[in-house]
């Protein structure tokens, strides 16, 4: 047997065909579902096979033959996770092997483990770049930091890392967007709000202290020249200059006497360190582009590793939660802290999370696409921004549940939007009134006079919203063309009928048998509607008739046999809706 590839175990020889007992099949299914939960829909056959053989050692001699069944069940479990969400995987596992969920509960405790170090006065921070609104990926930082802050009755700082005026410049509106989105996502206001651009005097002061202390210097080498020094582990000539000379050049940098790209301030470390990224790393550079808040007041701006390190110390940050790809930032900043004689905060890391439906988006890329009119704006329903998700009808509770589910793991994982949609369904279902939406409608006339004048349909099938939708209707109704077959059916929540081409005869108001149930709509209670459905880079539009009963703009409804959608606008001719999810 060789190592698993693409999550499936392969064998060098064809296994013999064995018809497995239902008991063995159930064991394999149990561990496949359990593994899919642990790996967020990317279960591993090798791991599943190991667990099966651990529980049933008598199967070890048949391991090769077992591979086919294991691969099949792992593929099935992963497909359920992708198409229906993790809650569906968990539901199936709980239905026949609830004890297998205990392992997940233990792992959740690990995923949301206690913070290391001193936790009496916890201070955390969430530090976005205000070059656009928050994305679903950003929301992880809001949620996880807020969760820990709440657990330890600590403080959370919202810090805008906005000291890049050239590559990813700030958008002035984004400050308010992000602050409001932070509150929406976390359910609370940040304890402190910091705009790094307004803290420039602090960074300039610390840079001067660093240069005066001899552990920072002005480097006049070009980027290519210093790259060669770094690769060869040699010190550049600028490193040995007197402090006074460095301070003179620092003054020239600050006053605009040196052009962009001609000088940087570096942190003196060790040019022989094994990690090239740590060798005399750049702390401040020249940027003459104006800033949307402070204008052209400053010519020298700190790079993120320096600015973030200084501000973390100034705010008393005790724990930093960041991506595992930023470990080098921790190492750089630790060296700077040692120079200043400070104690570095406790770092925690998480791995990347890829969401299948949103593979290649970046904030700067989205902005470019908005400017080129590929997207209508930051709330375009095809985008993974919080603005877009919120506009479609996703709740902050569902986003919190998603990140709580994933926890603080250093593993890179890949999930489907179906997982978030599953959480959102659970959160909003009890507050969503039901309505009917008929696609490709067919008109049917009642051929009998024994129909009541009013049909009373529950606002919510489980009664969480009291009251009924009382339909007063005429002789005609609409049904969906896919349901238009001559024969006996039940009109949902109304009557047993027999359809004969384009007419229907009521047979009984009570349900008398197990005939198919179809949804329907009185003609006089119908309005034309369009539902806009995001589909990758496309927007599909589905036309039909909607139930015209107490509709409200901005409200999410569940349309039976169709899914959740939000009403965007209502006029005399048309109701426009935005698709949410199944």
Task: List the predicted regions and their residue ranges.
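Short acidic (Asp/Glu) and glycine-rich catalytic loops that position anionic groups and cofactors
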Residues: 154-158, 186-187, 309-317, 365-366, ...
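N-terminal Rossmann-like or analogous alpha/beta NTP/dinucleotide-binding catalytic cores
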Residues: 4-238, 324-348, 352-357, 363, ...
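Extended, domain-scale alpha-helical bundle/helix-rich regions
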Residues: 39-56, 60-63, 377-459
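Charge-rich, well-structured scaffold segments of protease-associated domains
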Residues: 173-184, 209-212, 395, 405-408, ...
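Structured alpha-helical segments in the cores of large, soluble enzyme domains
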Residues: 140-150, 175-182, 296, 300-308, ...
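Active-site cores that bind ATP or allylic diphosphates and position pyrophosphate for catalysis
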Residues: 209, 213-366, 372-374, 385, ...
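C-terminal accessory/binding modules appended to enzymatic or scaffolding proteins
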Residues: 119, 450-582
């Amino acid at each position: 047997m060789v190592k698993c590839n693409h999550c499936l175990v392969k064998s060098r020889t064809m296994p013999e065909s064995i018809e497995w007992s239902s008991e063995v099949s159930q064991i394999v299914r149990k561990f496949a579902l359990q593994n899919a939960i642990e790996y967020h829909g990317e279960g591993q056959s090798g791991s599943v096979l190991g667990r099966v053989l651990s529980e049933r050692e008598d199967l070890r001699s048949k391991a090769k033959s077992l591979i086919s069944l294991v691969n099949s069940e792992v593929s099935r479990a992963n497909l359920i996770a992708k198409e229906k969400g993790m809650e569906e995987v968990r539901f199936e596992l709980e239905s026949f092997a609830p004890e297998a969920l205990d392992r997940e509960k233990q792992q959740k405790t690990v995923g949301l483990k206690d913070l290391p170090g001193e936790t009496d006065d916890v201070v955390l921070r969430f530090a976005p770049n205000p070059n656009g609104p928050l994305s679903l990926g950003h929301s992880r930082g809001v949620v996880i930091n807020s969760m820990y802050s709440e657990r330890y009755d600590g403080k959370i700082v919202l810090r805008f890392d906005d000291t890049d005026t050239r590559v990813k410049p700030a958008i002035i509106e984004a400050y308010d967007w992000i602050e409001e989105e932070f509150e929406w996502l976390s359910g609370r206001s940040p304890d402190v709000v910091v705009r790094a651009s307004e803290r420039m005097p602090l960074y300039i002061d610390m840079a001067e202290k660093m240069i005066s202390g001899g552990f920072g210097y002005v480097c006049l080498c070009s980027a290519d020249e210093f790259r060669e020094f770094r690769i060869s582990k040699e010190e550049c000539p600028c490193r040995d200059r007197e402090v006074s000379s460095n301070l003179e050049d620092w003054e020239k940098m600050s006053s605009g006497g040196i052009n962009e790209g001609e000088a940087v301030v570096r942190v003196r470390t060790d040019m022989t360190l094994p990690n090239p990224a740590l060798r005399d790393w750049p702390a401040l550079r020249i940027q003459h582009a104006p800033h949307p808040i402070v204008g052209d007041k400053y010519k020298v701006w700190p790079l993120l590793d320096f600015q973030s390190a200084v501000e973390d110390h100034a705010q008393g940050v005790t724990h930093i939660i960041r991506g595992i790809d930023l470990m080098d930032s921790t190492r750089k900043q630790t060296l700077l802290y040692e120079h200043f004689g400070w104690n570095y905060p406790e770092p925690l890391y998480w791995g990347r999370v890829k969401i299948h439906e949103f593979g290649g988006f970046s904030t700067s890329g989205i902005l470019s696409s908005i400017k080129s009119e590929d997207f209508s704006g930051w709330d375009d329903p095809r985008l993974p921004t919080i603005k877009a998700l919120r506009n479609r009808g996703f709740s902050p509770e569902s986003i919190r549940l998603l990140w709580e589910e994933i926890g603080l793991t250093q593993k890179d994982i890949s999930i489907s939007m179906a997982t978030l949609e599953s959480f959102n369904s659970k959160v909003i279902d009890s507050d969503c009134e039901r309505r009917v939406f008929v696609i490709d409608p067919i008109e049917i006339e009642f051929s009998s006079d024994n129909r009541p004048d009013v049909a009373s349909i529950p606002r919510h099938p489980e009664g969480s919203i009291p009251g009924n939708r009382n339909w007063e209707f005429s002789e005609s109704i609409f049904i969906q063309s896919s349901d238009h077959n001559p024969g006996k059916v039940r009109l949902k929540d109304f009557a047993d009928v027999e359809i004969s081409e384009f007419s229907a005869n009521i047979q009984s108001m009570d349900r008398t048998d197990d005939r198919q149930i179809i949804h329907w709509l009185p003609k006089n209670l119908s309005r034309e509607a369009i539902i806009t459905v995001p589909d990758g880079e496309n927007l599909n539009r589905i036309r039909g008739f909607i139930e015209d009963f107490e509709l409200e703009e901005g409200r999410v409804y569940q349309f039976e046999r169709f899914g959740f959608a939000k009403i965007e606008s209502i006029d005399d001719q048309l109701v426009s809706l935005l698709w949410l999810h199944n």
